[in-house]
Amino acid sequence: MSETIIVPHTPAPRADLTEAKRLMELGMHLVALKPLTKQPAGNEWNAPANRVTAIDPAATGYGILLAVNNVGSIDPDNWQQAVKGMAALGFDLDSIMDAGVRTKSTRPGSGGRSAFQVEGELRHLCFKTKQHGVVLELRATSPNLQDALPGVLYEDKTGKLCTQTYAGDKRWSVSSDMPQLPDDFFNWWEKCCTDLEFFRDQQEKFSAAIGGQGQLAVSGGKSGTELAYDARGVRGRFNKATSVESVLDRHGYLYDS
């Protein structure tokens, strides 16, 4: 008589949708993702009419729109090369990412992401080479950018199942409660967005540091050249830190207290 072998049933892994539910209830614009990917689902996925209003318990994850929620993120696709490239530009990428809402991925080689509130003239920038492909993205402003939320389940290029989780104590929230970028990095990112020649120079230095041939930007800012004026939001940090009275005092004006 043959012995019956009982194989224990292993339940399929499920996405953790806790954060998606919390952020939806905060009023943030979320988007549905294609099953087991980090790609948005459907046509016009970023339209207001298609924002998520209920969490599907069978979903494998949700994304958060960056521009409409006034947030942005740093996305190192190749962690080791991104660290090396940013070091050549004078920045400690690990410290900068620690300042934001940081997430980590189980995908090998991923540097995770770090999210911040967005102000000024920040926009989407990319550092890539012919040899390495995309190494680092600075993601902001474009209506076509979304970040997968912690808890997502997705397959990498090999079919391996991966997930993302928080990497520290900070959590996604409404923009006003999100961390600000460190001042020096904010100023540098903004200059890259408004001064094309500066940005191309930074791309070349980044690429040289990792032994690659850089694929350089062909336009910068909204005009493609250095801005000759202070655009909306550029003085935001100054205004927050400086009172009207102190400015008047500095220039010898009188005012009613």
What are the residue ranges of the model-derived segments?
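Conserved phosphate/metal-binding and DNA-contacting active-site motifs used
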Residues: 1-257
